[in-house]
Every structure is written in C-alpha cells, then in structure tokens.
C-alpha cells in the first residue's frame, strides 16, 4: 500500500498547522480555509487537519492513500475476499480533491477507514461545495454509513 492517512479534528486550524509544521519539519502540502494536509516523508504519513470546533482532539477518520485506481480496486477485492464489506465512492470530492475511494466496514471499535487515490485537485472541500461543512462523504449511502459529521471526512 501507499502511506497511512490520519485525519484529525482540530479546534483552531492555524494553531494546529503551526504545531504540526514544527513536529514534522514541513509545511502543509495543501492549505484551505479550515483545512490543511501534510505529506510527511518520514515517517510516511498523510496528516489531514479539519477545523471542527467542539470536536478538537479527536480522530475524524483513518485512511490509506494509494498510488492509483488499480490499487484501490485491488485492495477492495482483497478485503472482500477476506470477508470485509465496503461502501464504494467513485469520482467523489473530499478534502479539496476529486477521489476514487471506498470505506471499509466492520472495524471493531467503529473507526472509519478509507482507501483512496487522488484523481485531481478541487477548489471545493466536498461534493456539495459547502466549504464550511466538515463532512465530505460524497454519497447518501456513505453519509448514512458514517452517521455524524465528526465521523466522516
């Protein structure tokens, strides 16, 4: 696979960016209002910060960023063969990027895991274009799976 993604809810995006820039000795790869992501090389990590007041200090979701759509498909097939269900999202907009992804179902503690690849950059945070909405689940089916705003990207 590619690299692990950790998406955190933060109270103050500017304060969080300052802290994580120092922690990982790097600047954000992408910065938008209420949003930042870091492509950390060592350790290999995609760190996503989502300003979500009242939810700071909690995990938004976890993910694995992979190189291409073929890897998304192969991973989804492998997990299906292992008995894990998933919810497919193709061509969805999330975190200022158009993505092909799926959400893995059945984590024992309810964690939200996505496996995704970025197809292209986007000027909007999510599919609806509501940049102030910290949820970008993309489809009604995925939104019903993820439940609350804090539980999905």
Predicted regions mapped to residue ranges:
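Conserved beta-strand in the GNAT
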Residues: 46-50, 114
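Short linear motifs in intrinsically disordered
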Residues: 25-30, 67, 91-94
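Core segments of cupin and vicinal oxygen chelate
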Residues: 2-46
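Acetyl-CoA-dependent GNAT
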Residues: 50-53, 118-120
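Short, positively charged
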Residues: 16-18, 77-87
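Vicinal oxygen chelate
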Residues: 3-11, 39, 54-153
């Amino acid at each position: 696979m590619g690299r692990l993604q950790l998406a955190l809810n933060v109270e103050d995006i500017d304060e969080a960016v300052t802290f994580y820039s120092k922690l990982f000795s790097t600047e954000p790869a992408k910065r938008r209002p209420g949003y930042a992501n870091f492509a950390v090389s060592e350790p290999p990590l995609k760190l996503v910060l989502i300003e979500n007041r009242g939810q700071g200090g909690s995990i938004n979701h976890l993910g694995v960023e992979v190189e291409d759509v073929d890897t998304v498909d192969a991973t989804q097939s492998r997990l299906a063969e292992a008995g894990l269900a998933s919810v497919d999202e193709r061509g969805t907009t999330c975190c200022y990027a158009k993505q092909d992804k799926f959400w893995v179902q059945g984590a024992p503690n309810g964690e939200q895991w996505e496996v995704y690849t970025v197809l292209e950059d986007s000027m909007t945070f999510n599919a609806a274009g509501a940049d102030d909405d910290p949820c970008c689940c993309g489809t009604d089916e995925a939104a019903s799976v993820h439940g609350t705003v804090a539980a999905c990207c």
